[in-house]
């Protein structure tokens, strides 16, 4: 059975909406804390293995982005910083810092809810994920 559905030129997997809704829920938690509302989940084999939301203000940490928090949570839960076969669902297009972490973690697929014309590096400003010289592609 084909579990891909094409929408507006994009290919999505059935179930993607469920995981993006979880990321949106985490973004709302960030917003309630006065943070930029971004949430993220890491999924492996249809199961959420990591969750995170933006918290740089509350943690006084410029690296406390949703993607980084979700990657850290997944790495702890799986016992390895390398996360091949995992997918990342995030509400906003990743920035350069997060893209570097995503590449190092060897995430197989990144799904984001909205483009970020100021700092997005999955095509809005540049496309770091498309640079083959970055040697951590899965």
Predicted regions and their residues:
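Zn2+-dependent cytidine deaminase-like catalytic core
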Residues: 50-138
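Alpha-helical structural signal
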Residues: 16, 20, 38-39, 67, ...
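Short beta-strand scaffold segments in enzyme catalytic cores
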Residues: 38-46
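Short, basic/aromatic recognition patches
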Residues: 12-33
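Short, basic and Ser/Thr-rich N-terminal targeting/leader segments
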Residues: 34-38, 84
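Small-residue (primarily alanine) positions within well-ordered alpha-helices
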Residues: 23, 27-30, 40, 50, ...
